[in-house]
Amino acid sequence: MSASSAAARPGDAVTGAAVPTHRSAPGRPAPVVLFDLDDTLMAHREAVQLGIEQHMRIRAYDPVAGLDVPVLWHELEERHYHAYLAGELTFEGQRRARARDFALAHGESLDDPAAGAWFDEYFAHYRASWRVHADVARSFAALEAGLPGVRFGVITNGELDFQLAKLDRLGLTERFEHVVASGALGFAKPDPAIFLAAVERFAETGPLGPVAYVGDRLRTDAIGAAEAGLLGVWLNRVDATPDPAEAALARELGVLEATTLDEASALLVSRLG
């Protein structure tokens, strides 16, 4: 395993299928389909909600009038995790910041050590709730059937070891030829550089066919990929209404939209097959 990629090994813990070879139609390099991880393959948002609700029960926090707990925790995650991606906080620092702000909203003040311990307790509940989305295995099967020799990879914003632990826990590690994480590279989605780094990895290990990227964030994932020259697919699981300017840019770049991985796979087979 390199500093920012995980080599595929025979077998697959989710579907039992072997990792695909690079053979495709005669004279045609195999296509590459890259995925985001959180809320694309893994049901991250659901795990977060289950984790924070369990943590609140254990800490015996009283309800706060007008405070939506899952919404607050999601907003804190967005704010502080993006500060980490921007280099304003360390990985552990963004965790402590989320813990401090959430606890303070419930009347508890935490110093750094206490905030770290608070987050560790929450994280155990979050980790216990990790699950793959129900359409993941079907998507792999459909892509393999419709795109012979298709190669799979992951591009994710986060620390490599943490994201690899998720893939391993979910039984998905075997599926991917390369896993590219922003924490190992120093730049993050939507920077075109991270998408191009992934493409270079695949070019080094086999003939390179057309490359697509599937992710749940329109700007960060689909538009970012399209601006790097990939086919961007926005996995809009929650039927979100995009910002008009981003929607216009997505149309200009040829971004595809799907509400499930089943739909995304059908679109990719149609475009790349």
Language model: regions and residue ranges:
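Hydrophobic alpha-helical core bundles mediating ligand binding, dimerization, or RNAP-core interactions
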Residues: V48-M56, W73-E77, R95, A99, ...
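Alpha-helical elements of Rossmann-like donor-binding domains used by nucleotide-donor carbohydrate transfer enzymes
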Residues: L50-Q54, R79, R98-D101, E121, ...
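A metal-dependent, Asp-based hydrolase signature
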Residues: R79-E121
